[in-house]
Structures are given as structure tokens and as C-alpha cells.
């Protein structure tokens, strides 16, 4: 079950590396198109299929990624404009269980993901090396999170959920 839950493994933050940051920014740039390419032709029944037993549906995953990356974008801006801000956490599981996340068409979330990533990538590309060392405080994390780490975490997060959907499509033999 663990391989279904974490198909690309857990995120492990490496030491600061500006070249790695550039790779992550490119992955973030590509994520909305990759997500759209995977899900835009799925039927409503396929969108409502859980990616694993007791897991979210594809529809919930799409809405979750849009919600989560919106939060991440705000965290970058807080950390760039405030000194060690304490960010507001949210219960992603509860958000995904809202009827809206279970039944709304995915197109608004795909458009939102595209818009957020346009802004996020532009913000990341405008940052100086020292900016990536700025931090925010996450209430459920023991250590401050640097913007370098957050960049990697969200590049990983996108690939993590793309892998959930890709593997489901492959297991089910769905045409893409």
C-alpha cells in the first residue's frame, strides 16, 4: 500500500543548491500542462475513481493540488515580505472531503493551477539567491522551512500527485 501512497517516495530536502532550484522551477512551470494532459479526457466515472483503496478520487486530487499550490504561493509571498512569518495551516483532508471537492468540475481547478503557477514561476524567477534562504514557520513542522525547501517540496508534490494519476490510468488500462 505504501507504494500506492508514495509512488515517488517521500520528499527529502537536499542542501542548498541554486541549480537544483532551477530544475524545480522548470518542473513547477510544466505541472499545470502535465496535469491537464493527464485528466482532461477522463470520463466523470474515471475522475471519480480513487487512485488507491481509501484514497482520494482523481477529481479530489486535481482540486487538492490547486488548493495546496495556492497556499504555497501565499507562503512564498509572506516569507518574502515578512520576517519569519507563522503561516496558517489548513486541514487538507477535510478540504478534500467537502462536497465541492468531490463533485465540482475539474476545469476551474485546472485554470486556477495554471494561473497560480504562472504567478509562482514568475515570482521564483525574480528571486535572488538570498531570497531562497528566507523562511516561514509552519505550525506543524519542528523547524523553519526555507523558500528553497518549499520550492523543492512543491515540485515534488506536483510529481507525487501526477504519479498517483498516471499509475491509476496505467493499472486501469485507460486510454489517454
How does the language model describe each region?
Residues 26-38, 96-134:
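Acidic/histidine-rich alpha-helical segments that form the ligand environment
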Residues 38, 42-45, 83, 127-130, ...:
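A short secondary-structure junction motif
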Residues 16-20, 95-109, 140-149:
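Acidic/His metal-coordination segments adjacent to aromatic residues that form catalytic metal sites
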Residues 1-12, 48-93, 121, 135-176:
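Short, contiguous alpha-helical
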Residues 20, 27, 53, 57, ...:
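Alpha-helix N-cap/loop-to-helix boundary motif
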Residues 19-54:
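Short, contiguous, helix-prone interaction/anchoring segments in small proteins
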Residues 22, 26-29, 59, 63, ...:
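A generic "alpha-helical surface" signal
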Residues 1-30:
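Terminal targeting/low-complexity segments that flank the catalytic cores of oxidoreductases
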